[in-house]
Amino acid sequence: MNSGRPETMENLPALYTIFQGEVAMVTDYGAFIKIPGCRKQGLVHRTHMSSCRVDKPSEIVDVGDKVWVKLIGREMKNDRIKVSLSMKVVNQGTGKDLDPNNVVIEQEERRRRSFQDYTGQKITLEAVLNTTCKKCGCKGHFAKDCFMQPGGTKYSLIPEEEEEKEEAKAEGLEKPDPTKNSSRKRKKEKKKKKHRDRKSSDCDSSDSESDTGKKARHSSKDSKATKKKKKKKKHKKKHKE
């Protein structure tokens, strides 16, 4: 029974002390352990019962069991002492300290504090964003933070820049760009023109080659004819003589 006087930590073991205690009560969130030489009981939360996940503490311990624990926390709340114990950092067979440098305990404490800070900030922000101002009727702020003058312009939350950018991107994907299409058409037309020019140049070169061949053949025929005429003239002269 509490006599009305605030509890003190004088009879409690020192921080990080290892001792063997008896299980006094088992709940859904952990087990209460009797502290030797003290009327106070300490709580082993289910997250500190084992290195594995524990959903039901009653599957790990039962009332009257003797367990090895390590005192990992002592704090005063509303004139009452809250004692935190851990089973997973102590060998349950020998009572040996499995975390002599308290590394695991410090990591657990850091994680717990960061989680509390994050959830607190999240709840506060959601409460503010979902609040409707009684003064101007807009969402996102309280009446005490409203700067609207009587008869003035009302202002509400504007959409984030990222949302606007995403909408613009979606519109850009839906609507085809006419400049891109025209540039593609121009490129195709240029390729066709180049192909035509190459064909015409090839034809011209073949025609010129055929013309030169014909001229060469014609000139060779003329030279042969002149030679034959000369031979005939010489033959006539000899015959006269």
Swiss-Prot record:
Expressed in liver, brain, heart, kidney testis, stomach, small intestine, skin, thymus, uterus, placenta, spleen, lung and skeletal muscle. The modification Phosphoserine is found at S114, S183. Residues 16-88 form the S1 motif domain. Residues 166-178, 211-225 have a biased composition (Basic and acidic residues). PANTHER family: NUCLEOLAR PROTEIN OF 40 KDA (PTHR15838), ZINC FINGER CCHC DOMAIN-CONTAINING PROTEIN 17 (PTHR15838:SF1). This is Zinc finger CCHC domain-containing protein 17. Gene3D superfamilies: Nucleic acid-binding proteins (2.40.50.140). InterPro entries: NA-bd_OB-fold, S1_domain, ZCCHC17_S1, Znf_CCHC.
